[in-house]
Every structure is written in C-alpha cells, then in structure tokens.
C-alpha cells in the first residue's frame, strides 16, 4: 500500500491530490491522507510528491511471492493461501524477521540415527560450495558419517537417469503427440503449472525427478534403509509427501538444516 509519512509538508501545490485519478487523497489534520478503499495503487501520488513524503509499503514475503499466495487475515497478519502456494520458499528467505519457516525433520532424522537404523543421505550436487571452501566432497562425506549417516550418495546419478529417460520421452512425443515438453524436476514449477496453466499440464514430462530416481536406486539395494534427501530447496519437502513418493524418500533436509546439525555436532571441515 501507499502511505503518506510525517514528511508531508502540507504544500500549497497539493500535487498528490491533483494527480490521483480516484480522488483518494484528502487533507486531514494538516497532512495528506490516502483512503485505502479508493486507492488503486497506481503510484502517481508518490511520483508527484516533491518531498518524497509518500512511500510504497509492501510485505517482503508478499513481494517475493510470484503466486500471490500471501494474504492478510482479519487482524492484519500475513497468512499463506495453501490453494495458491507452490512451496517454492521465496517468502521464507525474504522475511527479515524469520517469521516464516518450513516444516523441519531434523528430529526425525536424528531419532532414526540414534535408533541405529541404516540412514542413507542422498545429496544434491549443489552441496559443493555450500559449507565453505574447506568442504571438499571427501570431507563432506566424512562429516556426514560423523553425524551418523551410514552412506552418502550424490543425486547426480539420478539426474543422469532422469536426463536419459526424459530425452527418450521427448523424442517419442515431440512433435508427434505434443508441441513441446517441459521438464519435471522442480516440484514448485510442477505445482505452479498445475495451478496457473492447467491446459499446459499435460506437456510436463512424466519422468521421475533425480531425487526419486536416486532414492529408488538406494531402496532397491537396501529396502530397509531410511533415505534422507539433502538439498537447497524447501519445495522438495512438498514432493516427498506425495502419495507415490512417500515410500521412497523418508525425510528431507535443506542445506541450512544440515548446517545446523554440523554446528550442533561440532563438525569443523578445516579439522577433518
């Protein structure tokens, strides 16, 4: 919303009032005031004010959300409309107060490790560079085993499997059955198309994601193990709770959550 600040000088020109196409600005107690019921947020008043006394105020989370899923309840608090949300996590990283969080599964992972279950971490290739310059692939694997993981598998192997199958799918269907094919790897993108562009949903490849390919490969080798996906994106948590995926990926951790586990355990990559 646009708001008139205390810097309003009650100038004789009243430029803000003159340029407003809806007559939403009036003089109240020696200062211009915007009627929110009339304001259309065109911004003309802010541009016309010679004192820069009118500012645009927007919630960082709402500004970051490309789905317009951030709304306000009756008390003015921000709420997430789950019918619009695609779990992309942009609101989460944009909130300067840390007021938005994704559902964590650190407790469940630690409990599985403490109960001596075989826990396998499948890690997105983006782990390189996430934990400082001392974090080489070899040191990262050692650090994961220090946390109690039995094995570490790179999801790059699943990405290769995904690429091969998706390429075969593309050659078979485009352009014989459809004009184009969109990738299937990102669950947030998948959900966005389903909600905003349902007519194009059938053009998304039905190939499994690298995470699922890797998880199923691990489960095939050891059906009783617990698979933990570790990556940069919170949207993977949405993917992992899907009915057809739930048995493949037991838990999901973000790199941020994994960093918290490293710190709690006292893991120092420089000392490994």
Functional labels for PLM-detected ranges:
Residues 4, 21-24, 137:
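Generic N-terminal leader segments that precede the first folded domain
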Residues 13-36, 44-81, 86, 90-106:
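Iron-sulfur cluster-binding cysteine motifs and their immediate structural context
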Residues 1, 102-272:
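Iron-sulfur-associated redox domains of electron-transfer enzymes in respiratory
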Residues 7, 37, 124-126:
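Short strand-loop junctions, especially beta-strand C-caps/beta-turns
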Residues 1-3, 9, 26:
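Flexible, acidic/Gly-rich N-terminal and inter-domain linker regions that tether
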């Amino acid at each position: 919303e646009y708001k008139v600040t205390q810097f309003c000088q009650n100038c004789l020109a009243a430029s803000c009032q003159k340029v407003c196409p809806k007559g939403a600005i009036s003089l109240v107690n020696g200062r211009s005031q915007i009627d929110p019921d009339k304001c259309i947020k065109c911004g003309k008043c802010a541009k016309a004010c010679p004192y820069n006394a009118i500012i645009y105020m927007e919630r960082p989370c709402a500004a970051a959300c490309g789905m317009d899923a951030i709304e306000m309840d009756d008390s003015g608090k921000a709420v997430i409309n789950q019918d619009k949300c695609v779990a992309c996590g942009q609101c989460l990283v944009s909130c300067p107060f840390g007021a938005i969080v994704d559902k964590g599964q650190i407790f469940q992972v630690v409990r599985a490790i403490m109960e001596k279950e075989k826990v396998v971490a499948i890690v997105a290739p983006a782990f390189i560079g996430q934990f400082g310059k001392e974090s080489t692939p070899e040191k990262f694997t050692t650090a994961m085993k220090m946390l109690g993981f039995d094995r570490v598998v790179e999801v790059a192997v699943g990405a290769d499997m995904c690429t091969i199958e998706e390429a075969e799918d593309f050659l078979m269907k485009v352009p014989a059955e459809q004009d184009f094919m969109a990738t299937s790897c990102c669950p947030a993108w998948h959900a966005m198309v389903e909600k905003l562009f349902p007519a194009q949903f059938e053009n998304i490849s039905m190939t499994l994601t690298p995470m699922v390919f890797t998880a199923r490969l691990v489960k095939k080798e050891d059906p009783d193990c617990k698979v933990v996906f570790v990556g940069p994106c919170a949207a993977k948590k949405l993917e992992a709770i899907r009915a057809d995926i739930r048995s493949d990926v037991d838990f999901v951790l973000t790199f941020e959550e994994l960093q918290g586990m490293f710190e709690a355990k006292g893991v120092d990559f420089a000392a490994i």
